Amino acid sequence: HLLQFNKNAIPFYAFYGCYCGWGGRCCFVHDCCYGKWDIYPYSLKSGYITCGKGTWCEEQICECDRVAAECLRRSLSTYKYGYMFYPDSRCRGPSETC
């Protein structure tokens, strides 16, 4: 949910270069946090994301999304549309493990 504050995450980042999707850099920590979407309370004030009170699991998932959203925001200036739907076969090196 929080990724929407940077760009619509699915079309812009799901298959972006070697940096998002399974095995990507900004998305790596996010991928390790969980493998499904969930709903949780959060707010956006002055460009800062704040996770609200919820169950322990909701708060942890929100924090995973917050960190990923901030990572993507820091990378916006280097976003290149040519890397959308980039083939995995062009990525070099082993993927990290969680």
Swiss-Prot record:
According to its UniProt record, which cofactors does this protein need? Ca(2+)
Please give the tissue specificity annotation from the record for this chain.
Answer: Expressed by the venom gland.
- Cofactor stoichiometry and binding? Binds 1 Ca(2+) ion.
* Coiled-coil ranges from the UniProt annotation: none
Cell compartment(s), UniProt: Secreted
The chemistry this enzyme catalyses reads:
a 1,2-diacyl-sn-glycero-3-phosphocholine + H2O = a 1-acyl-sn-glycero-3-phosphocholine + a fatty acid + H(+)
Q: Which residues form the active site?
A: 30, 65
Activity control note:
Inhibited by divalent cations different from calcium ions (cadmium, magnesium, manganese, zinc), since they act as competitive antagonists of this cofactor. Crotapotin F3 from C.durissus cascavella rattlesnake venom and antihemorrhagic factor DA2-II from D.albiventris opossum sera inhibit its enzymatic activity.
Gene Ontology MF, one = toxin activity
Q: What is its EC number?
A: 3.1.1.4
Keywords, alphabetical: Calcium, Disulfide bond, Hydrolase, Lipid degradation, Lipid metabolism, Metal-binding, Myotoxin, Neurotoxin, Presynaptic neurotoxin, Secreted, Toxin
- Organism the protein comes from: Bothrops bilineatus smaragdinus
Question: What InterPro entries is this protein classified in?
Answer: PLipase_A2, PLipase_A2_Asp_AS, PLipase_A2_dom, PLipase_A2_dom_sf, PLipase_A2_His_AS
Task: List the cysteine pairs that form cystine.
Answer: 18-91, 20-27, 26-71, 32-98, 33-64, 51-62
Activity dependence on pH, as recorded: Optimum pH is 8.0.
- GO biological process assignments: arachidonate secretion; lipid catabolic process; negative regulation of T cell proliferation; phospholipid metabolic process
- Name of the protein in question: Basic phospholipase A2 Bbil-TX
Q: What does this protein do?
A: Snake venom phospholipase A2 (PLA2) that induces myonecrosis, when intramuscularly injected into mice. Does not show systemic myotoxic effect (after intravenous injection). Does not show cytotoxic activities in myotubes and myoblasts. Induces marked paw edema after subplantar injections. Also induces an increase in vascular permeability and in the levels of TNF-alpha, IL-6, and IL-1 cytokines.
